[in-house]
């Protein structure tokens, strides 16, 4: 089992960010349980335990119930935690009552796409839906585009920011329809989205001022992957509260030096 460790270059910027690595999930559960047993903020203070998905949530809840006899703490997924941090630090207005969701993106793409198909940049899409008598292809295409746009908001927010600023220079000619379509979608919905809100969150956390509403600490368990946007948010959060990441590393070569 590798003891909590982090490179000195990272430690200088993230004094409360600790990574726990092991090639055995069971050992990571023991380390997590030891931290939970210590408690922070009193027995009624809710812990912020973050997992990748429903499967890990069920398994980890069962393991912790074996240790403590009962386990009733609600676990969160990464996007849910980031969304909550945005609302706590920046206020509900940062995301609005109905933030930009994948479903809303899908309906908006379907609504604005027909008016864009005459443009030369959309020639390939126009050919795809030209014999779509019942609108099935257009509906499915809008859904697939919405899924990709939603992933861009999480994994490539830099693209979204450039497109919204009118800069499509990063796109090949055949892909420029994506930037043009996003500009039209953003103009149509006029709602805040997570990429911009997280940038504002990171900036606010980086100011170093005390902030109300933050969790006493964050315990992230078994995350196999995490978007860079969320990593930056956790790094900024670690300036205020302890952030522990319990990482499953099957190969000893991936562990840090002792």
Task: Provide a role label for each language-model segment.
Residues 20, 52, 222:
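Small/polar loops that bind or transfer phosphate-bearing groups
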Residues 13-36:
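N- or domain-start disorder-to-order transition segments that initiate the globular core
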Residues 45-48:
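Short active-site oxyanion
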């Amino acid at each position: 089992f590798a003891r909590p460790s982090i490179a000195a270059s990272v430690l200088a910027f993230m004094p409360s960010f600790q990574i726990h690595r092991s090639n055995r999930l069971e050992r990571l559960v023991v380390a997590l349980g030891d931290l939970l047993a210590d408690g922070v903020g009193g027995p009624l203070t809710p812990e912020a335990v973050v997992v990748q998905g429903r499967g890990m949530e069920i398994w980890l809840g069962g393991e912790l119930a074996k240790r403590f006899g009962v386990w009733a703490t609600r676990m969160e997924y990464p996007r849910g935690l980031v969304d909550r941090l945005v609302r706590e630090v920046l206020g509900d207005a940062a995301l609005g009552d109905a933030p930009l969701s994948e479903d809303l993106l899908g309906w908006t793409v379907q609504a604005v796409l027909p008016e864009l198909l005459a443009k030369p940049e959309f020639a390939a899409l126009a050919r795809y839906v030209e014999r779509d008598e019942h609108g099935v292809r257009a509906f499915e295409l809008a859904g697939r585009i919405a899924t990709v746009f939603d992933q861009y908001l999480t994994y490539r927010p830099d693209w979204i920011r450039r497109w919204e600023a009118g800069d499509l220079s990063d796109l090949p000619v055949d892909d420029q329809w994506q930037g043009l379509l996003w500009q039209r979608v953003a103009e149509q919905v006029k709602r805040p989205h997570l990429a911009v809100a997280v940038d504002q969150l990171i900036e606010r956390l980086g100011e170093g001022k005390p902030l109300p509403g933050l969790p006493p600490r964050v315990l992230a368990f078994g995350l196999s992957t995490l978007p860079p946007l969320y990593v930056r948010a956790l790094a900024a959060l670690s300036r205020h509260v302890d952030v522990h990441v319990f990482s499953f590393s099957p190969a000893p070569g991936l562990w840090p030096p002792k």
